[in-house]
Amino acid sequence: MKRYILIFLFLVVHLFGAELAVEKNFKESIIKSDAAQKPLMFIVSRHTCKYCVMLEKETLSQAEVIEKLNKDFVVYIAYVDDGDGFPEEFWRPGTPTIWFLNDNGEAMSEPIMGAIDKTNLLQVLDSVKTKFDEEKNLQQYNYTKSKL
């Protein structure tokens, strides 16, 4: 019986205790993205924005989303009402704005504007990860080919 209780407690802590790893500034997140060979999910947000709060509380807090982001992405959230810095080229009117950047800090696509639910975000994350990996493989192939 003790064993089942311990297993249950482990699962509860593991599933509900997971935290999203969020970088503290834009430049450091690009450096980490490059070092880890992972894409960067960069969110422009505000504490007073209804949809920003919804995105964080209802989507980014889901265990499956946290696990996927922590495993396959580097995450940075810039709060414009806190004065968090990021390049002007990524500013768009309206928040939240979700960007996916390659490990060189270049946009992989146009941003997602507004909140997104768990199911759709997980689909987007899979798509972005696949595209990132394909681009990395192509770069490696071109590099190898140029050495021949």
Descriptions of predicted regions:
Residues 4-13:
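Sec-dependent N-terminal signal peptides
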Residues 26-61:
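Local sequence-structure signature of Cys/Sec-based thiol-disulfide redox active-site neighborhoods
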Residues 36-40, 71-78, 103-106, 122:
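Loop/turn elements at helix/coil->beta-strand transitions in domains of secreted/extracellular proteins
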Residues 34-35, 67-70, 90-94:
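Extracellular/periplasmic catalytic domains that process cell-envelope and extracellular macromolecules
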Residues 20-24, 62-84:
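Thiol-based oxidoreductase modules, predominantly thioredoxin-like and allied folds used
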Residues 46-50, 58-59, 80-84, 93, ...:
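Solvent-exposed loop/turn segments at secondary-structure junctions
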Residues 94-136, 140:
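Non-catalytic, surface beta->alpha helical segment in thiol-disulfide oxidoreductase systems
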Residues 17-36, 129-148:
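N-terminal leader/targeting and pre-domain segments
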